[in-house]
């Protein structure tokens, strides 16, 4: 779901990109919100809602958390502002948060999974990171069956309330 759009078609606040596959492939144990360092045209491109984070991952580099392999396409409106669409982008977190998440990654063998990129109420770009434990194939099947059952149950409840 995209966030609220202005006249120009840009997202002012709300969801810019979502990693639905991340929630399916990983059991999310804990989430946090982190700021992201972006250049001007990257923000404009992100506001158009054209970013992809399906293949993205977060990892440690020099004691900081970075977002790798996220795709933010070049903004077509700018002429002089070129940037690398898949460049690593620094995530802004407190030192204690970084230590907590890196400790969990090294101890439990978990992964830092970017779940979405959104704009908060102040218009700042944020990344929701999840500490995820990888799911096995049978766990994925169980998740699919559970999701289907919830959908069918909701459908039955809706249809049982109708008068014939």
From Swiss-Prot:
A Pfam short name: SmpB
InterPro entries per the UniProt record, alphabetical: SmpB (IPR023620), SsrA-bd_prot (IPR000037), SsrA-bd_prot_CS (IPR020081)
Gene Ontology process terms (BP): trans-translation
Places the protein is found: Cytoplasm
One term of GO molecular function: RNA binding
Top-level lineage group: Bacteria
Record has ATP-binding as a keyword: no
Stored PROSITE patterns: SSRP
UniProt keyword list: Cytoplasm, RNA-binding
HAMAP family noted in UniProt: SmpB (MF_00023)
Protein family according to the UniProt entry: Belongs to the SmpB family.
Protein name per the record: SsrA-binding protein
Native species: Gluconobacter oxydans (strain 621H) (Gluconobacter suboxydans)
